[in-house]
Curated annotation (Swiss-Prot):
It is found in: Cytoplasm. Zn(2+) binds at residues 81, 98, 105. Binds 1 Mg(2+) ion per subunit. This is Phosphoribosyl-AMP cyclohydrolase. It comes from Oleidesulfovibrio alaskensis (strain ATCC BAA-1058 / DSM 17464 / G20). The gene is hisI. Its EC number is 3.5.4.19.
Amino acid sequence: MTADLPDFVPDFEKTGGLVPAIAQDAVSGEVLMMAWMNEEAWHRTLTTGEAHYFSRSRGSLWHKGGTSGHTQHIRAVRLDCDSDTILLLVDQIGGAACHKGYKSCFFRELKDGEISVCSPLVFDPEEVYK
């Protein structure tokens, strides 16, 4: 998955080196997660076909699913009109994008004044991240 389009590059300079990257299920359209990408994560994502992000807490590159096996295979990449937000259309391998074990990181919902879990729990994080 390579892109040689000169204007198809996020504006990392404008955003201080990190841009938000939203992962969305390519089939269902469900939003799975939001993480950050720096230039290295962007290039690795495009060259490997799997999502790579930058972990602000660890200060390092992060291959999504590198520990859990729940990788994200890239089907398409989109940039917003200002080139400062990335949208990844992905096949979520292993069924879960969230490190807490849920299909989506957006697993909590406030609706009609009630808070509920709206995304299935796929795995036990204590078993996966030993």
